Amino acid sequence: MTTLPFPLAEAPDALTEERGRKLFAGNTDFLKGVVAMDGLPPADRIEVCFAGRSNVGKSTLINALTGRKGLARASNTPGRTQEINYFTLLDSHYLVDLPGYGYAEAPLHVVQQWQALLKSYLQGRATLRRAFVLIDARHGVKAVDEEIMKLLDIAAVPFQTVLTKSDKVKGRDRDASLARTRKALANHPAAYPEIILTSSEKGDGIPTLRATIATIET
């Protein structure tokens, strides 16, 4: 049987799933919003970040992971929230919510400021172990997604693709979306070789993503 490039991540075994559940069932709190590098918290724990286009479902996914609906809040205006938001997972992890990219509603100076901060963060955060790049399963990889992937390649930060809203696409449409995503990822050396398929609404893939984060080593 031919092995597909960038296969879907398999569901974790019972022990690994429980490890992920415990990480996200503990104290999960918003720590701070950061607008400049000198505002970053101490680099004293494992750090993962979530990146994605505006309206990709990033805040909803973070809330599904933590089981807290109001923890991460989506901006009503795409491209306007330009803070790097830090959340603590127990005393061992930072979960970092990067601003949604897609700048149709944002002034040029805001776009430039955000791009500079993002580049500095990705290249200068030694404890950042993995980025999770969220892609809407209905639409696949867009040009702005390619831009963030290129930044991650340059910064040598491993990134893993998470397809969101998978419950909204079925059968051949889902297969086509996966094929397009795999083709795009083949051009990026920093791409982690598994894709996680999620639905925040249905809970699909949430245990897998929790377990993946819980097993990332220092």
Swiss-Prot record:
Mg(2+) binds at S59, T81. Gene3D superfamilies: P-loop containing nucleotide triphosphate hydrolases. One of its GO terms (biological process) is division septum assembly. It holds the Pfam family MMR_HSR1. Keywords: Cell cycle, Cell division, GTP-binding, Magnesium, Metal-binding, Nucleotide-binding, Septation. GO terms for molecular function: GTP binding; metal ion binding. GTP binds at residues 52-59, 79-83, 97-100, 164-167, 198-200. One of its GO terms (cellular component) is cytosol. Its cofactor is Mg(2+). The keyword Cell division applies. Residues 44-218 form the EngB-type G domain. HAMAP family: GTPase_EngB. NCBIfam families: GTPase_YsxC. Belongs to the TRAFAC class TrmE-Era-EngA-EngB-Septin-like GTPase superfamily. EngB GTPase family. Necessary for normal cell division and for the maintenance of normal septation. This is Probable GTP-binding protein EngB. It comes from Jannaschia sp. (strain CCS1).
